[in-house]
Amino acid sequence: MIKRILFWSILPFGIPQGLLLRRNALRFGAAPGETFGVIGNGKRISLVAIGDSIVEGVGAGRADNALAGATAKHLARILEAEISWQAVGKIGATSLSVLKELVPLLSKNPVDVFVVSVGVNDVTSLSRTGRWAAHLTNLFKSLRAHSPKATIVMVGVPPFGRFPLLPKTLQLAFGMRGKTFDVVARQIIQQMEGVIHVPLDFDPQPEKFSADGYHPNAKSYSEIGLAVAEAIAAKPS
């Protein structure tokens, strides 16, 4: 309750800064290259990353350096397996737009692993926590209906409070809101079988970001992919 009051109290002071930021900020597109591939040798495992700009690879340099490709590279090494990977993403996607627009794009073939990246745009679009919880729950249920035996991994909401691009007021406001949304996500995941939360609790130094000051660079994508791959590998069969 206190965090919610603080967020809505601070936010009006950040709105002018946000408008100026929207006008002047660097904007990168999706990373070039194929959004699917196969890597490694051994037992074949299919992996689909679905979600926002982290799936699209903004700041990654190449599409195979983004969330799906980075996770696949590490997972192939850890499990000594052949990973067939695909990225289904949209810049600016929220939990609701992923559910309504991206899930219908999935192949009808069931997959072994889903990696989900949502939350950033739910925070910045000022979604209410109740809507966030409902949309996220429905997204997980939809993925489970698509692939009943899949492991579903959600990448945690990142630490807005240290994003170099954001002015201090927005760092504070979105930082608090992001933590709240991440707690809600954890609570939902605890009630679901076969769903894993991988926190983004890295130290967000400026050198961890791409030139836009908002998205990861290729090295950080690799670190996130490693964390996701280790979580998948550690899950009991």
Feature names for model-found ranges:
Residues M1-V48, G61, A229, A233-S237:
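N-terminal secretory targeting modules
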Residues L19, I54, G92-T94, P159, ...:
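Residue-level detector of flexible, active-site-proximal loop/helix-junction positions
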Residues A25, K90-T94, A173-F174:
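Short, flexible loop segments at the rims of nucleotide/cofactor-binding pockets, characterized by
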Residues R27-K43, K100-S107, T137-H146:
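Short amphipathic alpha-helices and their capping/turn segments at secondary-structure boundaries
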Residues S46-V48, I54-H135:
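Conserved SGNH/GDSL esterase-like catalytic core that processes O-acyl groups on lipids
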Residues V103-S237:
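Alpha-helical cap/lid subdomain in secreted, periplasmic
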